[in-house]
């Protein structure tokens, strides 16, 4: 175990695990698996996409072989438009060919899409095999890889098909961000800003104090690890309190209700998930101002920080009636009423279940 690694415990009653953050942790994946109880002869299916595998696939496979595991590597296409049943079939076919058993393991090596699909494939193969998440994008490191949400998209909406399936381990190696495209890095910053707004004022203010948070090359390694660690810890603490999203875990959807509408109406691929969430946060911030829940100055601070991160802050050109219709397809709608997580102050939010179409129209007219 590398003493320089940071360990965050996700202390769930039935499925506890750790988030391990540290440089060069990819090389030690075999040792980390041994530390949590896996033994030689373990059948492992590593799922990745070509771009990520070209950089890190050999390193992972060598570490697994060194620990006397039996790995197979599956390369599939990534991208939101690939997050479908056809991709799950590819993973299941590979699991069959690798003769995976219930005690076997799938490893998701990639961004949020690879993590979501591999997690869902693991949840549904043999009614559940082990999964380990090795996120290689900033967004996946601080959000998608933690908490056990897995799934794929449906033609009617994002993530409508899925399951809760907690990983056995989340392994985060910040050096993988070096090969991450600039736009993807900025998209990940949206989720980090989200954590600042929903639960961590100190993180929000830390980001405000930085001269540049939109370019990885201008962020010192110590700061990068700190913001990843704080964000991952925020996510873990919420998941511990509410594993299956029956209460406070809904706070993690801040900005996502409007964000999913943007992705759905604009078509998956037009905007990255983090970009859509950024615009969604600005929109719901305006909704909160309308309701008198938080001060306009806080909404402006949020928008400035989003723009500082190089993220879009202006609402896209969408028909308001189309937005209202799309909102009705949200998973969190109850009795026809749309729920929104809204800020009370920076570092504190609350879920509201009684938002009328009139209020939403007024908000969208204001920001359009």
From Swiss-Prot:
Gene3D superfamilies: 3.40.50.1970, Dehydroquinate synthase-like - alpha domain. The keyword Ribonucleoprotein does not apply. It is found in: Cytoplasm. NAD(+) binds at residues 112-116, 136-137, 149, 158, 176-179. Pfam families: DHQ_synthase, DHQS_C. Its EC number is 4.2.3.4. SUPFAM superfamilies: Dehydroquinate synthase-like. This is 3-dehydroquinate synthase.
